[in-house]
Structure formats: C-alpha cells, structure tokens
Amino acid sequence: MSKNTAEIKKKILMIATGGTIASKKGADGLTPELTSEELLSFVPEVKEFCEPTCVQLMNIDSTNICADDWLKIENLIEKNYDLYDGFVICHGTDTMAYTAAVLSYLIQNSPKPIVITGSQKPIDMEVTDAKTNLSDSFRFCVSKFASGVQIVFDGKVIKGTRAKKTRSKSYNAFSSINYPYTAIIQDGRVMQYDKTRGRGKPKFYRKLDTKVGLFKLIPGANPLILERYFELHDAVIIESFGTGGIPSDGTSGITSGGTGDNFGFYPVIEKWQKKGKILVMCTQVVNEGSDMTVYKVGKNLKEKYGFLESYDMTPEAVLAKLMWLLAEKKRPSDVKRLFYKTVSEDILYTE
C-alpha cells in the first residue's frame, strides 16, 4: 500500500455499548463482556481501508438501555464529530431500532455516517453473523454517499427512522418499514440506492422527555389502563388495529367500580385531551401505515379529539420523535405543528 493511499484513509470511531455481539456464554445465559478492542480484533481487515479507533461507552444488554444512555451516545459523538469521518456503534439488537430512531432526532442532517450494528450471535462463536455485520458497517462508513444515522445488518443499510426488528433469531433480523433500503452490501461492495446526504453542519440536540407512553390496544381492553397512561405521561401513543381506531361501543366490556355505569374509552380520551395531553394514533400492522379516515371508529375520533396520526411512521420513530419534541417544545400546539415535519425521512405521507 502506497503512502498516498494510507494518508487518505478515513478515520472511524467505533463505540461499543454491549449487546449480543459482545456477549459470552455463562451459567445464566449470554452476557456482554467483550471490550471494544476485542471486538475490533475479530475484523482485522477493516484496517486495510480505514483507521479505526475504539471506545467502550458501556457494556450492557440492550434491554436495559434508557434515555440517559442515548444522551451519552449523542454526547460522545458530538464531542468527537470533527475528529472522525464516521461512527460505528456496536449495539444489542433488541432495542437497536429505538436507539437508531432516537439518534436520528438527536443528531439531524449529519453529512457523516453514524452506523449502528450488532449481531444475532456473539462474535467469538464459530458460526456468527457478527464479523460480517461489523466489517460491512466500516465499509459503508467509508463509502462515497454514506451519511446520517443508519442501521447496517445482514447486508442491508436501513435509515434509522425506518428500521424495525422483525425476526428474533434469523440473521435478516431487521426490515425497512414503508421505505426502501439506503444501500445493499454484498461481497464487500456497497451498492448505494440513496445518494442524498446532509449538507452543511449537523444539528445536535441534548435533551429527551421520557413522559411518553405507548398503549397497545387489545380486544376488550380496560379503559382504566389508558386512564393511568394519561396520568403518567404528557403524550400517549395508542397502537391500534388496522388503519387506526378505538372501540366505540359502550363499555368495551368494562364497568366503572363495579357499578354497571358505562366507562368507555371516549370519556377518558376527552378528559385528557381537554387537559392538553398529546394523543397519537399508530397501527400494530407493520407495513403500509395508518389512515384514520377509513372507518367510523377512527374518523370520528380524529375529528372530535384532534388525534395526531403516525401514517407511515414506525412506532419506534413516533416514540422517539415525541421524546425529542416534548424536550424542545413544551406547548402542545408546537408539538402538533412539528410532528408532521419530516426529519430523516421519518414520514412521507400526511394529510
């Protein structure tokens, strides 16, 4: 390798946070133990095309991740942004889509790539997807059009606001929801589909509001549970059926205090909507999104109570966007106004 070639290698910061990729098997099951340096040692080939540096930010099972951890990741990237050409975050798969969505709002318009990856099998296993995923992440980072927050997994590059874990064990664990892949990586080659990239300087945000709840609707659900959600949160996402709606027939099988009095969802929603709570409707159906205008159970609700609607957004992105918006804009009117503003291709279809 010539001196000139070595001089133009891109500098990539690898941030290790734990997850399956760094886990070792013990008596109680898999636990993250490997360090960032140990992870990098399994993919020595990346040093041929970039200059990697490692940092161990945390070493946790991603099930345990929380808002404070997301802010630590943002802070580390912000402090090192001008020193590196890209970032690779090693992360557990279980909450990877949430982290990708949150970082997409905390770090906006980044002309540099911020890649999140992991694996379904630990990297020190004889048969594993970890080495390929980690190597592919570095390859994407140094590619010409790489930018923004992306998940790299099983040869697919997925925008951070569009990723969802759709398989619990298979190597092709993540899908891009209602949006095409950013790129495909095959045999070490990056085939870029999306050649747009952020211009100028990125915008960093340093706050999240965790008073956002997600209520998953089930047939015959107790409205009192939704009441409790509103008591604890400033914004509530209702993950409903199909295109979106709420049971409108009387009690939904529930009586208030055993008196036999009707206690349906509508009185609960009306009460808290008047108190300024943010209400968002999304769907449990993975693909094609919501449309509350289709059925009476959705249309009446939207017109009467001013529900926001996720449309083609993922629930992970809706949750992350509300956490970001509530931290920046305390007035419900501002949150509602900005909810439909596209950030990192999170939403394409609106009213």
Question: Model-flagged regions — what are they?
Answer:
Residues 1-79, 287:
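ATP/NTP phosphate-donor binding region
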Residues 6-11, 15-19, 23, 35-46, ...:
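Accessory alpha-helical/coil subdomains and C-terminal extensions
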Residues 24-28, 100-101, 126-129, 159-165, ...:
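Short acidic, glycine/serine/threonine-rich loops at helix termini
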Residues 28-37, 95, 101-113, 130-136, ...:
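A glycine- and small-aliphatic-rich helix-loop capping segment at beta-alpha/alpha-beta transitions
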Residues 90-112, 248-253, 261-268, 298:
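Short Gly/Thr/Asp-enriched flexible loops that form oxyanion-binding sites at enzyme active sites
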Residues 100-131, 138-144, 272-283:
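Short, acidic/small-residue loops that bind anionic groups at enzyme active sites
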Residues 116-186:
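Internal gly/pro-rich beta-alpha loop/helix module
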Residues 253-351:
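ATP/nucleoside-binding phosphotransfer catalytic cores, i.e., glycine-rich phosphate-binding loops
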